[in-house]
């Protein structure tokens, strides 16, 4: 188990992560509030689902206070749907409500990166004839909180639907520098434990590493989407993302993954016409892939000049964000390495809707300033 000390560093404790998660469940369910569990169908949420399910079967008194939500993104792999159907059956067997939400959530779309906005809408009524797949008959397909399609993303919608309840999610600090920083700030502010109040998010597996996730899946024999194995063969272990088909983290591997699913690529291109870019430019900087010559510094490209050219083109809807990044880069040019210029160029050319790469870039620049 990992613990934060003085909000600045991590230390290892003599407690395994599974036992730590169950201790957190004791604390969560001891609070006098109902609890909601949010699932995505990915590896983290499957582990969290199994942990909570085990806890509920040994603590039947908490069943009436728990409900489970799954946000269907329309464009998902068949194995993900199968895993969530199985999870639904498990929760039904213990009398816990399971809500399958097939609502018009908005999502990031890297194929429209110049807009830098959440432009793709799941189960958009205006594009019904082009849906990648139909939702199950039992799914919730409309809700009063949506006055128009794409009004909310799934995080915003869940916050509204579960207002007054403690929300449990499978977010881990190990996933990115940004999540680690956010969790550190939250724990430091709350005194070492996430504050238990209605509508507050709880992260029982925040300190799990990737190896903990896969070891737990193996030891428990949890059914998981086999598409992870195919993505591993394509992208390696650091890019195992299967949700949000059109986000920058997933879109690049779409064309290759579709080879395993007959008819899927045609459905994807019909739903998002710009998806052909993933097939044409998967091995390029558009999807943040770097050749050996670029890594070794022999690529012969002046990324500083390329960054300036991109900015001068004036094609960005949010030019203030670009100007801010370039201002930091130019102001501290003496600290900018070729790798940092290349990283900045990738952000500007490939898009960064969630601004994760922007925060990572600024953190790298800050670390250079402090050395």
Go through the PLM ranges and name each one.
Residues 1-36, 43-371:
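Nucleotide-activated chemistry modules centered on ATP-dependent adenylation/adenylyltransferase
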